[in-house]
Amino acid sequence: MSPSDGRRSWPCQLGPSATIDAARAPSRTPDWCIDASEVIEHLGLVPHPEGGWYRETWRDLPADGGRGVGTAIYFLLEDGQRSHWHRVDAAEAWHHYAGGRLELAIAEDDHHQVLTLGDALSSDCEPQAVVPPRAWQAARALDGWVLVGCTVSPAFDFSGFELAPPEWAPAAWEQPGW
């Protein structure tokens, strides 16, 4: 991001006067040199009720005042942090942006799966995944912090969000650690 967009530069572990913008030019600075707290501050993220950090970046506002066609957020999980089991009443696409890998658990009726999101060029990862409407989902960071985007359609509304009780898991869920 350029300084003209109103956002401040943020430091990395490359030195006291270095900024991410400067450090990444001309080659990309590895994500491991950036601390999660720096990403949280830079992107203006706030705590999410399901765990993790987020900020809404886009919301369709229809002229008739009804529910928009979509919303988008940044969502960050710190090392060891989870997004607890929850579901929403709309389809949700997860997109990997930076950091380590993310494990996304999805439970819909009798179909259960765990997907790994990460570097798009990695053979064991996908760059994105879609959770169907009303399917239970949970996520966890695998390798340090992870930054993803979540796009919900139709637009996310907290009235359509259900957070499961702590330690709850979907019926017949057989994956350990969830």
Positions of the model-derived regions?
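Non-catalytic, conserved peripheral segments adjacent to functional cores
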Residues: 28-130, 138-139, 143-146, 151-178
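Serine residues within intrinsically disordered or low-complexity segments
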Residues: 2-4, 9, 17, 27
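Short, intrinsically disordered, low-complexity terminal segments
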Residues: 15, 19-22
